[in-house]
Amino acid sequence: MAAASVSAASGSHLSNSFAEPSRSNGSMVRHSSSPYVVYPSDKPFLNSDLRRSPSKPTLAYPESNSRAIFSALKNLQDKIRRLELERIQAEESVKTLSRETIEYKKVLDEQIQERENSKNEESKHNQELTSQLLAAENKCNLLEKQLEYMRNMIKHAEMERTSVLEKQVSLERERQHDQTHVQSQLEKLDLLEQEYNKLTTMQALAEKKMQELEAKLHEEEQERKRMQAKAAELQTGLETNRLIFEDKATPCVPNARRIKKKKSKPPEKKSSRNYFGAQPHYRLCLGDMPFVAGKSTSPSHAVVANVQLVLHLMKQHSKALCNDRVINSIPLAKQVSSRGGKSKKLSVTPPSSNGINEELSEVLQTLQDEFGQMSFDHQQLAKLIQESPTVELKDKLECELEALVGRMEAKANQITKVRKYQAQLEKQKLEKQKKELKATKKTLDEERNSSSRSGITGTTNKKDFMKLRPGEKRRKNLQLLKDMQSIQNSLQSSSLCWDY
């Protein structure tokens, strides 16, 4: 520092000493009247724009040796001063750097310490986490074991429950079977008791009837004996009267004639006996039959006239009132057999189309109900398959589902067949209706043509009405209705008037 002060003092002295001649010289240059221009002190070069500081002026003329030495010394002093300043700055910068390095080391040490502390904390935390994870894994293993044990327990409980339920169901079925068997036995016993009571009552009635019949037979036997006695008396009386009459009337008749008469009498008795047995119909007394005055015996819709017709038929020998054997001349056994055959044929007659349609609709309804039940079972099985915990149960349910799908397909085929058959019946019914309509149209056209040709609508008798076919009456009524509708449509309100 002392050297720096000495150099600074010497530099200031030299600068003062150098400054004085320059001032004197400058004054000389300024005050001298010369033809040359003064060279600018701040431009080292004339052809360039470079400028210099006023502390370092440029001289246009060469300096003297002393001045050059002074300028060199001055420059050296400036350099020394600059170097001193740089050294001082360097020392200060070194000091600041040492301070900064110390501070940086402190900061680094603190950061390293913090990192080590954080690492230690992280390691501790990681150790705690690993210990917690191990404890959690142990707990999970224990819970899994407990869960497996609980599953096994639930399976065993379900198996036991199913076995108990199956036993209960089997016992219930056996009990129901026993109950039904006992009930059937009791019903049979009741039926047997009822039949026994019926038989006892029937037996009592039969015994009563037998007693009544025996009494009647006894009475009839007595009556028959009386009649036989009376007949014998009458026969003897008749014989005596005949003999008396023959003796009186023809005393000279030969014996052969008497024999013939005697032979011819027994068949007459037989014919008189068989007369009532061979009656073909009821013979009524004409005096008991009434007569309605003013009524004809022709067929009519009036009830009184029909009564008169019946009375007329009963008075005459009408085959309508005779026995079937008389009319048909067929034995009774054959007639019964023919009636049985007719009844069988009538019983075998096919059912009507309406009954078939009703039966088909009922069958279709039942099939559709069964198909709906199967679809519901299908949905339930699908839910059970989704919720099934084990693979075995899932396989069993899938097998059941496949079987159910097969049954559903078969049921759908049955439904389609029934619907096809129903559609065929509907088509046949429509075709029949079309044919009937065509036939009715033809008959109506024929009737129109016949009515247009004749122009007279005659009234049909009862015999002609009976000769008509079964559908003719309906067709005629339909045609009459159509004609009335056409007449009503053809009439207008203006054409109608009332005559008073």
UniProtKB/Swiss-Prot annotation:
Assembly, per entry: Homodimer and homooligomer. Interacts with microtubules. Interacts with FGF2 and RAP80. Does not interact with FGF1 or FGF2 isoform 24 kDa.
Region (Mediates interaction with microtubules): 277-491
Residue spans of biased composition, Low complexity class: 1-17
Chain intervals with Polar residues compositional bias: 18-34, 451-460
Taxonomic classification: Eukaryota, Metazoa, Chordata, Craniata, Vertebrata
Family: Belongs to the translokin family.
Short name of any one Pfam family annotated for the protein: Cep57_CLD
Its biological purpose: Centrosomal protein which may be required for microtubule attachment to centrosomes. May act by forming ring-like structures around microtubules. Mediates nuclear translocation and mitogenic activity of the internalized growth factor FGF2, but that of FGF1.
Gene behind the chain: CEP57
Protein name: Centrosomal protein of 57 kDa
Positions of modified residues (Phosphoserine): S53, S55
Swiss-Prot/TrEMBL domain comment: The C-terminal region mediates the interaction with microtubules and is able to nucleate and bundles microtubules in vitro. The centrosome localization domain (CLD) region mediates the localization to centrosomes and homooligomerization.
Region (Disordered): 1-34, 43-62, 434-472
Compartments reported by the entry: Nucleus; Cytoplasm; Cytoplasm, Cytoskeleton, Microtubule organizing center, Centrosome
Associated clinical condition: Mosaic variegated aneuploidy syndrome 2: A severe developmental disorder characterized by mosaic aneuploidies, predominantly trisomies and monosomies, involving multiple different chromosomes and tissues. Affected individuals typically present with severe intrauterine growth retardation and microcephaly. Eye anomalies, mild dysmorphism, variable developmental delay, and a broad spectrum of additional congenital abnormalities and medical conditions may also occur. The risk of malignancy is high, with rhabdomyosarcoma, Wilms tumor and leukemia reported in several cases.
Region centrosome localization domain (CLD), residue ranges: 58-239
InterPro entries given in the database record: Centrosomal_MT-associated, Cep57_CLD, Cep57_MT-bd_dom
Compositional bias ranges of the Basic and acidic residues kind: 434-450, 461-471
Record's GO cellular component terms: centriolar satellite; centrosome; cytosol; Golgi apparatus; microtubule; nucleus
Tissue specificity: Ubiquitous.
Keywords, in A-Z order: Coiled coil, Cytoplasm, Cytoskeleton, Microtubule, Nucleus, Phosphoprotein
